[in-house]
Amino acid sequence: MKLWAILAVCILLLSSVSSIPLPSNWLAGKKRSHLPDPQEGEDQVFGMDGAVPEDPTANMAPQDQQTYTEIPDDYPDQFDDVLEFIQDTIKRLKRSSNKQPPSRRDRGRQSLAANTQISSKKTVKDRKRKNKGCVLREIHLNVTDLGLGYETKEELKFRYCSGSCNNPETTYDQILKNLTIRKKLVNDKVKQACCRPIAFDDDLSFLDDNLVYHTLKQHSAKKCGCI
C-alpha cells in the first residue's frame, strides 16, 4: 500500500471520529449516569430519600441533549483505537522513509564496482591461462611402473614437465623464430624450444623384492623451462 493511500485512510478515520462533537458537559453527565458500586447498597441507587436520580441531560442545552443521545457508549474507546492506529501508521511511515531505495547515482556506483571486480577476476584468469605454457606436474606411482625393470613395492611422487613453448622465453628464441619464418635458415634445421626439466629432484634409493639396493639419479623433475 502506498504512503499517500495510508495517509488518506488515517485522515478519513480521524475525520469520521471527530465528526461527532462532544457536548460541554457530556463527560460529567457520563460519569453521573454510571451505576453505583453494588457494595454501597440500594439507597445510593435511588437516593437517600427514595427519589429517582437526576437525569444527566436535564442541565444540557437542547442541541447537546440530542447529541448526547446519539453518542455511542464506546465512543472514547473507538477514538483511542483510531489514535493508536494513526500513531502506528506514522511510525511505519518513518521506518519506510529511513529505508529509501538507493539513488540512481548509488546504483551506478555499485554497478561500476561490480563490473570492475568482474573484470579484475577475468584479467587474473587470463594471466593464468597465458602462463600455463611449461608447467611442473606430479603423479603418484610405484617404482615398478617406471618401466626400468625393477620389481618392488616402493612408491614415489614422479614430477614431470608438461606444456608448450610457443611463447619465446629469450631474445635468442625470438630471433630464431623470426629467421625461420623469413626462411633465412633454409639449410639449417632449428628445433623449437621444448618444455623440459632444468633441475631435478634428489636421488631416490630403494630395495627391490630381492632385497637389492638401487639408486635412481635425475629421475624426477624439480623445475621446468623451455630449452
UniProtKB/Swiss-Prot annotation:
Superkingdom of source: Eukaryota
Disulfide bonds: C134-C195, C161-C224, C165-C226
GO CC terms, sorted: extracellular region; extracellular space
CDD domains for this protein: TGF_beta_GDNF
Propeptide segments, given as residue ranges: 20-93
Pfam families: TGF_beta
A molecular function (GO) term: receptor tyrosine kinase binding
Gene3D superfamilies assigned: Cystine-knot cytokines
Tissues showing expression: From stage 22, expressed in somites and the pronephros. At stage 24 and 26, expressed in the pharyngeal arches I-III. At stage 31, expression in the eye, central nervous system and pharyngeal arches IV and V increases. Up to stage 34, expression becomes intense at the oral cavity and lateral line structures. At this stage, expression weakens in the pharyngeal arches, and increases in the epibranchial arches. Expressed in the digestive tract in stage 34 embryos.
Renumbered residue ranges of the record's region Disordered: 32-61, 93-113
Localization per Swiss-Prot or TrEMBL: Secreted
Annotated keywords: Cleavage on pair of basic residues, Disulfide bond, Glycoprotein, Growth factor, Secreted, Signal
Residues carrying sugar: N142, N178
Annotated GO biological process: branching involved in ureteric bud morphogenesis; enteric nervous system development; glial cell-derived neurotrophic factor receptor signaling pathway; metanephros development; mRNA stabilization; negative regulation of neuron apoptotic process; neural crest cell migration; neuron projection development
Keyword Repressor found: no
InterPro entries associated with the record: Cystine-knot_cytokine, GDNF, GDNF_fam, GDNF_TGF-b-like, TGF-b_C
Span of the signal peptide: 1-19
Assembly information from the UniProt record: Homodimer; disulfide-linked. Interacts with GFRA1 coreceptor and RET: forms a 2:2:2 ternary complex composed of GDNF ligand, GFRA1 and RET receptor.
Protein family membership: Belongs to the TGF-beta family. GDNF subfamily.
Function description: Neurotrophic factor that enhances survival and morphological differentiation of dopaminergic neurons and increases their high-affinity dopamine uptake. Acts by binding to its coreceptor, GFRA1, leading to autophosphorylation and activation of the RET receptor.
Protein name according to UniProt: Glial cell line-derived neurotrophic factor
Native organism: Xenopus laevis
Top-level taxonomy: Eukaryota, Metazoa, Chordata, Craniata, Vertebrata
